[in-house]
Every structure is written in C-alpha cells, then in structure tokens.
C-alpha cells in the first residue's frame, strides 16, 4: 500500500508537482507528529485532537441505557451494558475511537476502493479486488443469509461507529487524514454493516489454502521432472508428526464422524472422495498425499500457455495487499489445550498464538463485552481478541467456555484454465456466455476507470486483470487434450468464499456457547475461512472441531489447475459438516493444532474425504506434543507459566537433524572453521543473542539455495537473483554456450525455497542419500561444482561464513541471530514503502528477535528472501479455566492506532520478551485494574 500519497494526483503538471506534493506531506506529518511549529493550526494539538476521550461522560443518541467503558493501564477497554444492542453499539464507538483509520483502509481494500483514498497507484489492486468481488458477496450474505439477530448487532455496531464520526473532520479522527488532505479531498464516509461482513472475506483470502502451491507445481514443470516435483512435495509424515485428530473414525453407515468410533470398513456413499490418486493427466504423486497427475499439467511439463497464464496470475496475487501475512509453508498458528488431568489447577489450560504479518497497529484489538446481567435481553459476557471493524470476539472466552483458532489449511480454491470462443467459453462441448458486470473505479485526483469483470461457471476470470495475460491467452499453446483453439485461454478462480455464507452468525454463536454441543453447532456455521477450532470449558472438558465449507471434487485433487471445459473436474458439493473430524475428551488428555494434518486421510477406511494435498508438515505441532509429554510424564503437572514457556520455545528441529552432519565436514579454511565451531555444543535454540543460531540459519539458507533454489524456474526465485541456466525445456546435452541469463521474479516474502517445514521434510528424505542429484550444484567463478552431500555442505558452510562476515562483521563472537532477524513495525499505508522521513515518524522498531521458521516461537523468515521477520505470533494468550482472572494475554502492539498515543506500541517490548499481561475478567478484578472510566449515556 502506498505511503506516498502524492500518487493520487491526476494533474498533468508532471514530476515536479508530484515532488512538491510529496514534500508537503512529509513536512506536514513531521510537523503534526513532532509538534514542530507549522503555524498555530498545525501544532501538537492536531495530533492530540484524534486521541480518544477515555474519562467522563459522552452523550450517545441511540443507546437505551448507560454504558460503562473501563480501560486498564494498557488502554484495553471492558464494556458493560444492559442490552445486546447497547453493547455492540458501544463496541463500534470505542473501536472507532482507537482504530478508525485502520478500519477505513480495510473497508476500502475489501471493496476495491483504495484508489478513492490513495489515487492512481492503487488502480491495478482495485481492479483485482473488484474482480474477486468480496464486497458484493458480503452484501449477498447480509441480505439473504445472516440471521435477524446478527443483522441487528451489525446495525448497532455501525451506529456506534457513525456516532463517533458524526461532526468530525478527518484530522479529528486520525493524523493520517490530515496528511491525506493535502493531496486530495477525501473525507471518511459512514460505516455500514456490510463493511463489517466483508472483513471476513479478506480473512478468508489470506487463509485460503494451497493456491500458491497449485501454481508453483505447474510452474516447476518448466525446469523439473515429475519425480523431482514429487521430491519437493513429499508425503506427510504421519508416523513421526501426529495429526490433530487421532481418535475416532468416519462411520460409513451414518455418514458422520464418530469421535469415539472405529472404522466400519470400506466407505461408500461419501458423496465422492475428492483427491482420488492419479485421476486426469499423467505422472506421479506430489504434495502431502496429493497427486502431480490430477490436473492440466499432470506430471509432464505444463504447456507454455498455462505456464504464462499462471506466472501472470502469481504476479497479480503479489499486488493484492497481504492483510494477514504471506501465504506459504511454515506459516500458520499454534493452539493447544491440556485437560485438568495434567494441570496444576485440575482444570483445562488453553493456549493460542496465531501467526500473521506484523502490522502497526496489530490486526487484533483486545476487548471485553459484558452484560451487567446475562439474560435473554443481554446474552454476552465475553472477553478476548476482536477485529477492528467487526462486532463480537473472534478468539477468547465467555463465562463458561474458551476457544482458540489456527488455520485449517483446507484446499478451498481451484484454478481452471478456460477455453475462449467468441464472447463465450467452452464447457462440455458447448459454448456458454460469460456472466459480465461493469465496475467503476473512482480515482482520487484523477479520472474514474471502468472495467468489465467476466465470470465462467467456475468463477471470475482473474487473468483478465493482467494485460499481458490477455495477450498471451489468445496465443497460448496448450498440449493437454482440449477443444479447438478458438480465441485463447484464461484462468478462472473457484473459491468457497465467493458463495454467501453464515460465518458472521458463527462469531456471535461462539461468543455465547455454553458447552461442546453449542460450540460445535456454532462451528458448523463457520464456513469461511476454514479454521481449526479448539475448545475447553469450566466443567473440565476439552475438544476440537474442524469446520468449514470444503469441496468434494470429481476428477483431480486440487493440487494442480484443472481444465475448465471438462465437467468431470467440477466440484460435486461440499463435505457434510457432520462428517468433518472432531475430538472430545481424548484419552491422551490434550489436543495440539499447529497447522499439521488434521487427520490421516491416507487411510480411506478411516476417513474417505480429502481435506487438502498441502498440509503443514508438523514440525511445530510435534515439538509442542513432545513438550507436553515430557512435562506430564511420571505424573507431572502443567501450569500457566509452563504454557507460556512452551509458546516461547525457540528450538530448531532442522538444526537437530543437520548439525551433527555439518560438524563432520572437514573444513580447510580457518575462518570458516572458526564459524563451524560455533555449532559445537549448541543446544539448537534460536535465542536472539545466539551466534550459533545466526550461523546455522545462514548455512540452512545456503543449503536450500544450492540444492534446490538454483534449480527452480525464474518465476519462483527471488527478484534480483540471476543465474546462467539452460534454456527452459531444453532436452539436448548440456552446452555452456547455449546458457541464458534468467533473473528471479518473485517478491522476497513469497519466493522459493522459503525454508518452511516442507523443506525440512525434503532434506530429511534425501539426507542419507549422499549422491542424490539434489546435492549436485554447478561450478561458479569462485567455487567448484558439488557432486555429493558433503561437498554441498562444505560450500554452504563457506558461503554462510562470508555472508555473515558481510552482514555482521569478521569477529564471530559478535554475531547474534537477533541482529539478522529483526522486526520493524510499519504503520498502515503512510508507514510502508514510502519516504524515509515519514516511515521514521510513524513506524517503530527494530526489535532483535529469537525464534524462527517452523519454531514454536514462530517469528518467520523466508530463506529465499533474507533473514528479516515476515510473520509473527500476532498475539499470545493462555486461558485458565479454573480462574479466568488468572488467564494471561498480550498483543503485538497496543490498543491505539494513533501514533504517539501512550498505547500505540506499549505491549510490544513485553511481547518481544515473551511476557504476558494479566487478563482481568470478573467485575471485581476489572474494577480493581481500571485506570480510566468513560460513561456513554443516551
């Protein structure tokens, strides 16, 4: 998103005026935020004008009774009301006080209207977002799917937001509006209930599953053969890394999942078992149980036209704002629950830490919503983490139950190559007309732009949003059996979130659920995004439910793009909710979910449906499992502090595997040997001050680059990495004279190999095969070719030494992982990718962090792109079901979205150290911790 708002100017005065406008914005922001005299008007008071009133009384038309807003020393509000409508109206008012700029940017993103705020620089992004149509689907949900009660709450929330906005200029709402006002005349508009619903679509997009893997597998075929692609998508290691659900089975008679049952033999009548091996195309298997032969490319080289289309789609995806974070292997969340049998309190403990992109302010907003007396008139007494712009609590607890979430990772998207003929597309031997609509994109400081969005029976044509793709599609050569050429090809997206659903109903039902039955009933409505839901209650029960709208496929397993003209590849429906896996009070006494496989679906007798071909590979989940078992063996008990320490576990699973091998390498160079010795006696923990962790992670990065990265096509490699390679598709003998120079095309956050736990499994499988072809790397001007594992390891040890010498200095004793692995928090829009002074004023950091890729303390980095932190535990919580007031929580930043407010980043230092804050819940404890009290009166 732009930080230089001068891009919104549509005048013809050229670069000089753009530079002048940019200087105005920079000077203005500095003047406002720093309190530099810019006339009487632009004084420090302009900054403080947008700070919320947190004491005294405010009259709020529309309330039926008084509402108390009690804030603790961190500015976290607890709201007390006598009716549901008053409660959610107050929630809207308070969140707008602290976070309206964030809310406004989000709703412009979800509706494809960023250009209205930031000008022509965002037109391409808006075109893609309009094509996806998040806001259109959200409106359909609101109009036709949501319950009357949910609509009432959404309306009350919107009323509260608008009550805050009433009579205020932009500069009174947030300092960013004051800066924006010098480049265009944008003014915030009223909030609508649909604005809140649309945020769930944005969530679903960033948590959509395996679409990038689907693209990558096809793009790999230009450089890799079927067996090589299979190597890079190994089977899930069920025996070593346990799935979430280990008890129960699908009942072939009742067609339901039975948490206490056993498989009843061959399953039939499951409505089609998507993911049947080897259907369509040719070639072997790929993905975690998926097939490389289940779509257009099969196991052979993807046709040139398909590769061009998918490369363009990948580029278009990079342009869409990453709301929650990068979408790839190793990214996800941790949540686990331990029954009272294994805890000091005798009641369950539940932990959760979702891994998302670092944002300022945090994507989460801590809040309590309390009815003074719970009744039919006022049903809620809930506390936890909310999203600014959306009523209710997303993760947290009420007076009876607690719940957490991690990304299920279900495959809910498919790409279809569509065959065009005239003004239509081919399907089942016929030409069908496109469904089309016209969209008008308004541009701040410029002319509006009209676009046409076309859809097939599979979904919107996302390839239309790339001019180059339109040209390529007309000339595409497609080898796969297809109808006559006609007028080219395009790529359509089918995605479960583009069908209206009831996920907003689920939020409110979760907030008032009182037992596991009510929890599961609410979970059944949580259709998108598909999340692992973990559960505990005051009565001592623990549980888990896999919800979501997950497709059942005919041919294909979703691991590769499918031919849109073939009806056999259409979805056949969705997995019934009562057939989705769950657990309730498992015998082992705990449940761990950290994006690993939900269930062993390789055994069709136990479970006939395919949830995905692309699970996370379970490095984090198994480490958590091991920590729980080690703590509870011989009757040991787990405390809240133990749960916190588990969340901060920095252990590197891949280091445990590789370091013994690396220490056996005979290193000749004394400076490289000096670095190698850092690994001797290392305990494999990636603390911020660890020199060994810094060196190992650099070695790991170089192993991946030499063994895998340099063999990938340019479409997957990081931008700026240029190699001399054989021409793509070359089948003749190697010829140095014919090599061409190819440079990577991927953004650093999404390039491959990213170093996630999929690559742990790739390297694990070939580690003992010392002459495997993956260990072979060509010679360079300074290095000899490597012909085996130890030669490649020696080269990686050397390359890492010089890499860190350049970055951290010659003296290895001064090295530390945290100096490489740094977190900078960037304010939305004005704090990202913009002029340095503006970033300096609005951003915070850096912090030197421990943890790493696929560690439990998952401070993620992309090995192809660098060492910097690209996703984090966006919050951490531990819920104590014995005494909610002894629960703990922390947010990445603070409650406020206002730069220089005391609560802008007041939790970040504690978060970085792994500390947690007290989490008050009962009236007495909240009152004791109250620093500010605001009364909202009708």
Name each model-derived stretch.
Residues 2-5, 10, 25-26, 31-349, ...:
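Substrate-recognition/specificity elements adjacent to catalytic centers across diverse enzyme folds
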Residues 526-631, 685-688, 699-713, 720, ...:
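Hydrophobic alpha-helical segments
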């Amino acid at each position: 998103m732009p930080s230089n708002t001068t891009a919104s100017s549509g005048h013809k005065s050229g670069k000089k005026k753009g530079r002048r406008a940019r200087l105005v914005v920079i000077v203005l922001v500095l003047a406002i935020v720093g309190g530099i005299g810019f006339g009487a008007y632009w004084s420090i008071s302009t900054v403080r004008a947008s700070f919320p009133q947190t004491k005294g009384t405010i009259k709020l038309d529309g309330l039926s009774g008084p509402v108390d807003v009690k804030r603790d020393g961190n500015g976290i509000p607890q709201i007390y009301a006598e009716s549901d409508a008053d409660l959610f109206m107050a929630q809207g008012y308070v969140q707008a006080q602290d976070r309206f700029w964030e809310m406004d940017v989000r709703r412009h993103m979800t509706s494809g209207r960023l250009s209205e705020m930031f000008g022509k620089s965002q037109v391409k992004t808006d075109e893609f977002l309009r094509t996806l149509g998040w806001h259109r689907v959200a409106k359909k949900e609101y109009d036709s799917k949501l319950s009357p009660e949910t609509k009432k709450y959404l309306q009350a929330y919107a009323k509260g937001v608008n009550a805050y906005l009433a009579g205020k200029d932009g500069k009174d709402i947030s300092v960013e509006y004051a800066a924006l006002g010098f480049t265009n005349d944008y003014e915030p508009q009223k909030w609508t209930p649909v604005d809140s619903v649309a945020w769930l679509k944005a969530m679903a997009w960033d948590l959509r599953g395996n679409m990038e893997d689907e693209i990558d597998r096809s793009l790999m075929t230009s450089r890799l053969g079927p067996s090589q692609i299979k190597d890079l998508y190994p089977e899930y290691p069920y025996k070593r890394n346990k799935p979430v659900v280990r008890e129960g089975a699908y009942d072939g008679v009742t067609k339901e999942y039975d948490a206490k049952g056993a498989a009843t033999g061959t399953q039939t009548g499951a409505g089609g078992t998507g993911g049947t091996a080897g259907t369509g195309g040719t070639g072997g298997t790929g993905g975690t149980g998926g097939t490389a032969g289940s779509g257009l490319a099969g196991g052979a080289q993807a046709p040139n036209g398909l590769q061009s289309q998918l490369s363009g789609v990948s580029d278009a995806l990079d342009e869409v704002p990453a709301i929650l974070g990068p979408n790839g292997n190793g990214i996800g969340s941790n949540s686990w629950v331990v029954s009272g049998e294994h805890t000091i309190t005798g009641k369950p403990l539940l932990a959760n830490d979702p891994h998302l992109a670092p944002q300022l302010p945090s994507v989460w907003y801590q809040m309590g919503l309390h009815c003074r007396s719970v009744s039919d008139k006022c049903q809620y007494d809930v506390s936890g983490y909310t999203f600014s712009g959306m009523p209710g609590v997303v993760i947290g607890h009420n007076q009876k139950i607690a719940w957490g979430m991690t990304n299920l990772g279900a495959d809910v998207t498919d790409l279809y190559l569509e065959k065009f003929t005239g003004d239509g597309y081919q399907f089942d031997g016929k030409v069908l007309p496109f469904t089309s609509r016209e969209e008008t994109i308004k541009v701040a400081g410029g002319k509006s732009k009209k676009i046409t969005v076309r859809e097939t029976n599979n979904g919107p044509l996302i390839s239309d949003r790339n001019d180059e793709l339109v040209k390529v599609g007309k000339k595409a050569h497609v080898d796969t059996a297809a109808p006559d050429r006609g007028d080219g090809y395009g790529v359509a997206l089918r995605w479960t979130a583009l069908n209206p659903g009831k996920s907003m109903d689920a939020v409110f039902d979760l907030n008032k659920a009182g037992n596991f039955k009510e929890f599961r009933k609410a979970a059944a409505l949580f259709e998108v995004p598909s999340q692992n839901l973990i559960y505990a209650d005051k009565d001592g029960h623990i549980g888990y439910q896999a919800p979501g709208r997950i497709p059942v496929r005919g041919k294909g397993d979703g691991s590769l793009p499918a031919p849109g003209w073939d009806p056999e590849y259409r979805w056949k429906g969705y997995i019934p909710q009562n057939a989705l896996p769950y657990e309730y009070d498992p015998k082992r006494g705990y449940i761990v979910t950290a994006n690993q496989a939900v269930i062993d679906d390789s055994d069709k007798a136990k479970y006939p449906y395919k949830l995905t071909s692309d699970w996370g590979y379970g490095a984090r989940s198994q480490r958590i499992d091991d920590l729980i078992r080690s703590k509870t063996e011989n009757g040991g008990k787990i405390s809240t502090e133990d749960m916190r320490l588990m969340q901060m576990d920095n252990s590197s699973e891949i280091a445990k595997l590789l370091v013994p091998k690396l220490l056996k390498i005979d290193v000749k160079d004394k400076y490289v040997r000096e670095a190698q010795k850092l690994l001797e006696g290392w305990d494999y923990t990636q603390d911020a001050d660890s020199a060994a962790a810094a060196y190992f992670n650099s070695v790991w990065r170089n192993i991946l680059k030499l063994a895998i990265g340099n063999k990938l096509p340019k479409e997957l490699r990081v931008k700026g990495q240029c190699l001399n390679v054989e021409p793509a598709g070359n089948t003749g003998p190697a010829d140095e004279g014919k090599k061409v120079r190819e440079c990577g095309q991927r953004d650093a956050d999404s390039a491959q190999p990213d170093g996630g736990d999929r690559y742990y499994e790739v390297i694990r499988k070939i580690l003992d095969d010392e002459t495997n072809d993956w260990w072979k790397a060509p010679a360079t001007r300074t290095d000899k070719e490597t012909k085996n594992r130890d030669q490649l390891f020696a080269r990686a040890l050397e390359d890492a030494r010089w890499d860190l010498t350049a970055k951290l200095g010659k003296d290895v004793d001064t090295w530390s992982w945290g100096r490489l692995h740094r977190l900078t928090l960037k304010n939305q829009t004005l704090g990202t990718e913009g002029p340095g002074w503006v970033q300096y004023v609005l951003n915070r950091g850096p912090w030197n962090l421990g943890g790493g890729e696929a560690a439990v303390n998952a401070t993620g980095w992309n090995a192809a792109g660098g060492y910097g932190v690209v996703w984090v535990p966006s919050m951490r919580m531990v819920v104590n079901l014995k005494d909610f007031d002894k629960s703990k929580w922390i947010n990445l930043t603070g409650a406020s979205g206002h730069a220089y407010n005391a609560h802008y980043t007041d939790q970040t230092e504690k978060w970085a150290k792994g500390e947690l804050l007290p989490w008050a819940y009962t009236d007495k404890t909240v009152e004791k911790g109250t620093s500010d009290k605001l009364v909202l009166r009708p």
